Amino acid sequence: MGTPGEGLGRCSHALIRGVPESLASGEGAGAGLPALDLAKAQREHGVLGGKLRQRLGLQLLELPPEESLPLGPLLGDTAVIQGDTALITRPWSPARRPEVDGVRKALQDLGLRIVEMGDENATLDGTDVLFTGREFFVGLSKWTNHRGAEIVADTFRDFAVSTVPVSGASHLRGLCGMGGPRTVVAGSSEAAQKAVRAMAALTDHPYASLTLPDDAASDCLFLRPGLPGTTPFLLHRGGGDLPNSQEALQKLSDVTLVPVSCSELEKVGAGLSSLCLVLSTRPHC
């Protein structure tokens, strides 16, 4: 038997989707979203892909940009992946639901078992789902409802699944994330701290907690692409984006910190974990 939580972050592949020109205008990105600097957004996205491929050594698969899917680069909302199973989500926004099609095919081609939502009353954004290595927490938010959370529980029956209220327009992973198999990192806002308190009340597992000045800094990815026993990585927002949180992140001494920027993509709602899907095609990972 492995150590509880040891499966957290095991990965061999990463999936991203290119940034389309339609994201550069507020109209293309959707009602209420600001215009952004397309070239800067594409540079940020390119650097992220380079870090995943070169620094972490992952097999990188990049779906081409689609002008009809301005928010297509936020493909972390389109699937929840654990082990060899991928739950294809039903995003809250009807305009975003076609985004799942290309992701579904890519994950099928990688040999994952595909599970569909199959309920028109359910909504689920993937960035409302936090996997700790031991259990799932699903944020009940503007984007994800109870029925969506129930389908997560039905899909991943080997794990406990608990729901956490999320206020405002945030996703759960925009408030908290995993800094390691036993460490929850969370922002300092009342919404983030409320979510962490709710998680602590619901779990049977002890987690350490690290508070970061910026909520967005907690949207990080703990990744173990190497063999067991090798030092894991923490992909996180760097000092150019969130300088106030860098000192606190240094307290995570058991990981190699890999900073990236997504300050331009953040303008249209992108958090770091929304910009990629990571998975393992290796057995027993």
Curated annotation (Swiss-Prot):
InterPro entries: DDAH-like. The active site is at H171 (proton donor), C276 (nucleophile). Its EC number is 3.-.-.-. One of its GO terms (cellular component) is mitochondrion. GO terms for molecular function: hydrolase activity. It is found in: Cytoplasm; Mitochondrion. It comes from the Eukaryota. Keywords: Cytoplasm, Hydrolase, Mitochondrion. Its main location: cytoplasm. Belongs to the DDAH family. Putative hydrolase with unknown substrate. Does not hydrolyze N(G),N(G)-dimethyl-L-arginine (ADMA) which acts as an inhibitor of NOS. In endothelial cells, induces expression of vascular endothelial growth factor (VEGF) via phosphorylation of the transcription factor SP1 by PKA in a process that is independent of NO and NO synthase. Similarly, enhances pancreatic insulin secretion through SP1-mediated transcriptional up-regulation of secretagogin/SCGN, an insulin vesicle docking protein. This is Putative hydrolase DDAH2. It comes from Rattus norvegicus.
